């Protein structure tokens, strides 16, 4: 038993392990998306870079959760990371819609985890989730929803190319 463990319920520990797996899955999916857009027959470098950064961000989230788990005296249980259901996307719009779906699922999972922390009176864990994850999720979902809207507006082909060039490569924040 860990000497630092205090007021850290096993249900919270299990939930963190599930969330770590979900964050790593999202990272893996975004990495697949990044590589798809790097292909010579797709050639959208803005999408490639956007999804590469998203992959790294999700990996960092997993590491943050691992460090928190260890800091609270919990143990990390490594699980298989599911492979992405697809590694090909018909368009940037399709990939952004999938990214939006994944971010919403991650947000739902984090909210459920916050509920577990609250149920077990773990105010430190609640504060950690709110400060490190939940606000960022809302911002990311908003940004992705805007990208989906604009990609629908500009259409495939030249419109998608211009979106890649002006929005993703153009430094829009």
From Swiss-Prot:
GO molecular function: ferric iron binding; ferrous iron binding; ferroxidase activity
Record's keyword annotation contains Chaperone: no
EC number: 1.16.3.1
Family annotation (Pfam families): Ferritin (PF00210)
Keywords for this protein: Cytoplasm, Iron, Iron storage, Metal-binding, Oxidoreductase
Name this polypeptide is given: Ferritin heavy chain
Reactions catalysed according to its record: 4 Fe(2+) + O2 + 4 H(+) = 4 Fe(3+) + 2 H2O
Residues annotated to bind Fe cation 1: 23, 58, 61
Protein's cellular compartments: Cytoplasm
Boundaries of every Ferritin-like diiron domain copy: 6-155
Entry's Gene Ontology BP terms: intracellular iron ion homeostasis; iron ion transport
Subunit (UniProt): Oligomer of 24 subunits. There are two types of subunits: L (light) chain and H (heavy) chain. The functional molecule is roughly spherical and contains a central cavity into which the insoluble mineral iron core is deposited.
UniProt-annotated binding residues for Fe cation 2: 58, 103, 137
Lineage: Eukaryota, Metazoa, Spiralia, Lophotrochozoa, Platyhelminthes
